[in-house]
Amino acid sequence: MVTIRLARHGAKKRPFYQIVVADSRNVATGRFIEKVGFFNPTAQGQEEGLRIDLDRVNHWVGQGASLSDRVAKLVKDAQKAA
């Protein structure tokens, strides 16, 4: 099953997440099909905290991909801001 989820990157105590489309059987930070955005929970000042390509997310959801709980909330927030 294909899922859209967060892949953690960044340094210790400084998380940075890539929003990726991946097979659910793969490791969370491993192989992925496509990167559709990023999420920086520690963004300050003028730093961009969230960027999601909503067209690609909608494409993958139309193809049957499922969203993780956190990504679903982030997509909802991005749609509200757009």
From Swiss-Prot:
This is Small ribosomal subunit protein bS16. It comes from Vibrio vulnificus (strain YJ016). One of its GO terms (cellular component) is cytoplasm. The keyword Ribonucleoprotein applies. Belongs to the bacterial ribosomal protein bS16 family. PROSITE patterns: RIBOSOMAL_S16 (PS00732). GO terms for molecular function: structural constituent of ribosome. GO terms for biological process: translation. The keyword rRNA processing does not apply. Keywords: Ribonucleoprotein, Ribosomal protein.
